[in-house]
Amino acid sequence: MTTTTFPDSAPAPADDARVIALIGFAHGVSHFFHLLLPPLFPWLMAEFGLSFVEIGATMTVFFVVSAVGQAMAGFGVDRFGALRILLAGISCFVLAGLGLAMATSSSALYAVAALAGLGNTVFHPADFTVLNRHVSPPRLGHAFSVHGLSGNLGWAAAPLFLTGLATLVGWRVAAASTIFVAIPAMLLLWHNRALLDTGHHAHAAKQSGHGTFDFMRVGAVWLCFAFFFLITAAFGAIQNFATPILQNLYQLPLGLAATALSTYLLAGAGGILVGGFVAQKQANDRIIAVVLGIAALLALLLAANVVPGWAVLPLMAGIGFFSGIAGPSRDLLVRRAATARFGQAAYGRIYGFVYSGLDAGLAAAPLVFGGYMDRGEYAAVLI
């Protein structure tokens, strides 16, 4: 068993709170722009005559660009500092929103998806570099908890914002209005630049005696990447297909099946909050194994189709809650993998590479599990 513990006291709680809030808000903005396109799919399909496959491919473009770029963005964070890279990423979101508002062809939608994906590349390496450098170790568990929760809130806000405006004033105005989400984040980060700047660490990396790519020889880094890929592919399967799965397995009406998915996501947010307190005590790989094991058992029970329909919502809540608990401990264990041999000089590179597994998993999920859905093997997706 491996455990990470922290000292009981730390200075500057007010500064810690400011850093956590600023990075949390920026992360929420990044998740908001994950969903720049999907809430507008009905309008975009009608405008440009696209099929579900064609419009869905925009998200494949988004996550492929994000996965590849995230691994490279970590090098930029280590070289130029996290603040500059964060501002560059949010600038891409501004351009993506304006580009979508002015789109005149389906090819423009793919360009917008690529630009938004490029903006998304910076957040995990930059966010976690700032948090690890500027938040006191005793509060890192809570910092990672807020970071994860803010992402969920960004996901929740985007459909309400975009569909609401598109219904009232049209999809182009809705797309253009997203700049009023991104620009305040840029201004806040710039205003607090002295608090957030991580400096340049390329020279420190050279002085440490480690080569630029030496981290890729560490087995723990590859294990973290594989773990992120697998767990996010599973999340993507539920996020994309839970509603039709539950409709077919349990004959639930559409509204109730969609409510079950919302229940899963909200319970996941609650789990992240609880997970922050768990991780603050000790970031333990056994805890991660136990809570994910419980979530897997609940998913198997749901897939077995042996429970009554009323039990679907509690089971979905349980899957989301226990999966969420693992998040902050997972992030702290990645921190340990980053610092064990390379200290602070390689935060950006290691976080960028490991967390590119998230986007790779989200990109792969529709392709891998979509085949099961097409064949009517709904339970297999949950298994």
Model features per residue range: what roles?
Residues 147-194:
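Helix-loop-helix hairpin linking two adjacent transmembrane segments in secondary transporters
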Residues 112-151:
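Cytoplasmic helix-loop-helix junction between adjacent transmembrane helices
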Residues 37-38, 220-265, 269:
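Extracytoplasmic gate region of multi-pass secondary transporters
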Residues 3-14, 196-224:
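Juxtamembrane intracellular "pre-TM" segments in multi-pass secondary transporters
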Residues 285-330:
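C-terminal transmembrane helical hairpin of 12-TM major facilitator-type secondary transporters
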